[in-house]
Amino acid sequence: MIDACIAGVLHYAENAGLIEADDRLWARNRLLEALQLDGCDPDCAPAELPLADLLRELTEDAVSRGVAQDNSVARDLFDTKLMGVLTPAPHEVRAKFRSLYAVSPEQATDWFYAFSQNTNYIRRDRIARDQKWVYESAYGPLDITINLSKPEKDPRAIAAAKLAPQSGYPKCALCAENEGYAGRMNHPARQNHRVIPVTINGSGWYLQYSPYVYYNEHCIVFNGTHTPMKIDRAAFRKLLDFVGQFPHYFVGSNADLPIVGGSILSHDHFQGGHYTFAMERAPVEEPVRFRGFDDIRAGIVKWPMSVLRLTGPDSDRLVELADRILRAWRGYTDESAFVFAETDGEPHNTITPIARRRGADYELDLVLRNNITTPEHPLGVFHPHAALHHIKKENIGLIEVMGLAVLPARLKGELAALEQAILSGADIRADETLGKHADWVEELKTRYTFTPENTADILRREVGAVFAQVLEDAGVFKRNETGRAAFRRFLGTADQEGSL
């Protein structure tokens, strides 16, 4: 069976374009070396199994022979090592990308995305486990996902990671030094990972795909230098420069402050892709004019968070206006709206920017963020409030801001258990795991009659409704007359700021 799996992996690699016919013997011997085997039957017919199953068979055999450790992380390290043997060198990948880019940017990214899946860097079998549905909200269709593709470490892997020596190389999971890195118990293997150099705003960056693919062609654009996230004029310029080079992609940045930022603030990076989020579809509901910028269409977007959209043919002009708005927002305080530029020297105001092309025009969405905390809301005033934490308590980053909920894996089991508990009449409040959902379920019971046929659908729909509330909580200026008046006050200040 092992000989058939080796033949199967080689057959897969050739069909996927990772190796050519001339590479067969070389690739087989490289695999044997990685597997610590002295030989195999060269005439063995390939096992007709999906790649994930082939790798699983080879890895389990290696574990049984003591070649790989018996835990989940070690298994990932080992099967990535096997795929690394079959992954073309960076110069080959980049040459192919450049040749396709000369034909069209879209052809280049189509190929690179498929390549990143074919190398098993993007593990398609795990992505397929993610649960996804759409919630029709007042703001348009929101994407709801329960993320199951990020591997959860088993207890043995966690224990091994604690014992593993600490290393400062690579400095973080985004650094270019990850390309080809063997990994360790506390850092993922990346032998099958390739990145594409891109120049934006005159500086060296790289393009790669996220291994977890929250949406179609979910890419990461990261600085070649390990430098902290920073939202400034140069960031706007880089975002618009990128969509100038890849007009079929959007690209955005997480905010640069804790709570309202993403999970990695230490390495400057953007996220983008070939996907239309609900926020992009959302219309401008109130046009705004800025003096001296009659060439730019601006307005407040119909969205639960506070979004200003700028659209125009000249990207330099968008950068100029976005920078004016950012500078005004950084220093803006409106106590009546509970907006404070800083407290005790700690800054609170920043922006989550998203860039795209809309036809021949450039477009920037500027999402106003504030990370102030209070005793009542210790995780953030403009953050999911405590009543929603049973569904989502993590940071609301770029992806959520645009209308895609990335919900924790725990919800898969909890929603299934809740369905059974509701139908059986069990005491949810007394349940150690499900008790956090008790208030929510009691409220749902006042609006629904649950049956075996409708309970799962109701829970999914209401999870979507909670996510819409999460976004409303994260909005600085609330969607009522008071909030709208406060938004207008800020915009007036931003206009004056530019006319001084």
Where are these regions (language model features)?
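Active-site microenvironments that recognize anionic phosphate/pyrophosphate groups
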Residues: 1-221, 225-228, 304, 318-322, ...
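Helical scaffold of the NTase/Pol beta-like nucleotidyltransferase catalytic core
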Residues: 192-194, 224-251
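Catalytic or ion-translocation cores adjacent to nucleophile or general acid/base/metal-coordination motifs
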Residues: 234, 243-266, 272-326, 330-333
